[in-house]
């Protein structure tokens, strides 16, 4: 292989150089400290597992199986999967490894691998960070998760200009159940909603039971008042539909109270991972960015695969995506070589204060540390730090 090809990386995989790595690592630490302050306990999950464990979501989310790298275990001969999402692993921990009663709060951070990018120009090796709450089915748990997600993003971004989208799969799901639609028609409608294809939606819904309601759901997806005005009374009286609608209204009201300067929108037909989520869904977007900065929702019963179904809600984000375009100059102090005790004491004190200090080796001079920003100099019998 030519030398020119030995340094090439696969598509969607990149090195993270010091100026950005410092930003990412600082955010990771701040985020985990923030989550700890909210009561979320850190867990580490293995990079590989038997595919049966990682594929628990594949029955409801075929996309996850498609993005999971698979290899043969040289010890057992069984099929292993490289984690593409940590949620199944946390579900296994909650259901089997740490099967406590009551509410459990978890957080995690680590690299996941995808066989193909999940969004345009996204990494195939994102640094996933997330938080999950198990054991509480109330709307308050969902609202807490949205609040925690926004607080975490605030660590990296000024919330000005950001946009929170709220949705609820229960609206579409209860309408599908009431109309008695087949799985194929349900999937076709979901696809039309995702593409915002209103002309096609209008044509398709003409022949469906509650067709005008399905059309109204897409036509007025971002305006709850207009949506209610155009829905039939039968649908508005449906207990499941009404509960979902009320939950969405309550969430909107409470998040507006907690985050008064945040732009919040509604999209009742945002059905990403529709077969996986079971209730409220939420995502935060930045200007000129197609993919969300963070997203999550409710996914009750996720632990059933491991023998313990529990209510669950949570969110995740890619720390690399959160830090796109952010770079930090790393202040580096250069100290002269030598064994002078006063010098060594000054170096130790500076490092203890959180500064980065490099002591020169042998006869090296400043040119050996081209990224140095400061130097340690002796002045009036005191070692001082001066900008270069």
UniProtKB/Swiss-Prot annotation:
GO biological process: histidyl-tRNA aminoacylation; L-histidine biosynthetic process
Extra remark: This function is generally fulfilled by the C-terminal part of HisG, which is missing in some bacteria such as this one.
One of the record's GO cellular component terms: cytoplasm
Subunit organization: Heteromultimer composed of HisG and HisZ subunits.
Function text: Required for the first step of histidine biosynthesis. May allow the feedback regulation of ATP phosphoribosyltransferase activity by histidine.
PANTHER family listed in its UniProt record: HISTIDINE--TRNA LIGASE, MITOCHONDRIAL-RELATED (PTHR43707:SF1), HISTIDYL-TRNA SYNTHETASE (PTHR43707)
UniProt main location, coarse: cytoplasm
Presence of keyword Magnesium: no
Protein known as: ATP phosphoribosyltransferase regulatory subunit
InterPro entries from the UniProt entry: aa-tRNA-synth_II/BPL/LPL, HisRS-like_core, HisRS/HisZ, HisZ
Keywords assigned: Amino-acid biosynthesis, Cytoplasm, Histidine biosynthesis
Similarity field: Belongs to the class-II aminoacyl-tRNA synthetase family. HisZ subfamily.
Disulfide bonds: none
HAMAP family tied to this protein: HisZ
Gene3D superfamilies in alphabetical order: Bira Bifunctional Protein, Domain 2
Gene Ontology MF terms in the entry: histidine-tRNA ligase activity
Pathway connected to this protein: Amino-acid biosynthesis; L-histidine biosynthesis; L-histidine from 5-phospho-alpha-D-ribose 1-diphosphate: step 1/9
Domain of life: Bacteria
Compartment(s) of residence: Cytoplasm
A family per Pfam: tRNA-synt_His
């Amino acid at each position: 292989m030519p030398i020119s090809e030995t340094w090439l990386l696969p598509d969607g995989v990149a090195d993270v150089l010091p100026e950005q790595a410092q930003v990412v690592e600082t955010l990771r630490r701040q985020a985990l400290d923030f989550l700890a302050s909210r009561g979320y306990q850190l867990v580490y999950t293995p990079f590989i597992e038997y595919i049966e464990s990682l594929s628990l979501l594949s029955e409801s989310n075929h996309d996850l199986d498609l993005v999971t790298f698979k290899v043969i275990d040289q010890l057992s001969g069984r099929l292993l999967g490289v984690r593409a999402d940590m949620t199944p692993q946390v579900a296994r921990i909650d259901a089997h490894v740490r099967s406590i009663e009551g509410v459990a709060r978890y957080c995690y951070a680590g690299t996941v691998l995808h066989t193909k990018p999940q969004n345009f120009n996204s990494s195939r090796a994102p640094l996933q960070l997330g938080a999950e709450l198990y054991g509480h089915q109330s709307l308050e748990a969902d609202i807490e998760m949205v609040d925690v997600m926004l607080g975490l993003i605030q660590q990296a971004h000024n919330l000005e200009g950001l946009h929170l989208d709220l949705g609820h799969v229960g609206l579409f799901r209860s309408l599908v159940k009431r109309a008695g639609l087949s799985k194929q028609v349900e999937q076709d409608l979901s696809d039309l909603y995702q593409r915002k294809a209103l002309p096609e939606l209008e044509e398709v819904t003409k022949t469906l039971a509650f067709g005008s309601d399905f059309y109204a759901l897409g036509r007025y997806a971002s305006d709850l008042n207009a949506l209610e005005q155009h829905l039939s009374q039968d649908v508005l009286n449906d207990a499941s539909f009404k509960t979902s609608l009320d939950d969405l209204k309550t969430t909107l009201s409470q998040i507006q109270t907690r985050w008064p300067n945040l732009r919040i929108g509604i999209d009742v037909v945002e059905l990403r991972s529709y077969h996986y989520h079971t209730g409220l869904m939420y995502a935060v977007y930045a200007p000129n960015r197609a993919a969300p900065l963070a997203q999550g929702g409710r996914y009750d019963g996720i632990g059933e695969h491991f023998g313990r179904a529990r209510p669950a809600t949570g969110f995740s984000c890619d720390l690399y995506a959160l830090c796109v375009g952010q770079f930090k100059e790393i202040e580096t102090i250069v100290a002269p070589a030598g064994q002078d005790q006063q010098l060594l004491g000054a170096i130790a004190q500076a490092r203890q204060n959180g500064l980065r200090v490099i002591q020169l080796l042998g006869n090296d001079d400043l040119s050996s540390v081209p990224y140095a920003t400061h130097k340690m100099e002796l002045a009036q019998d005191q070692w001082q730090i001066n900008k270069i």
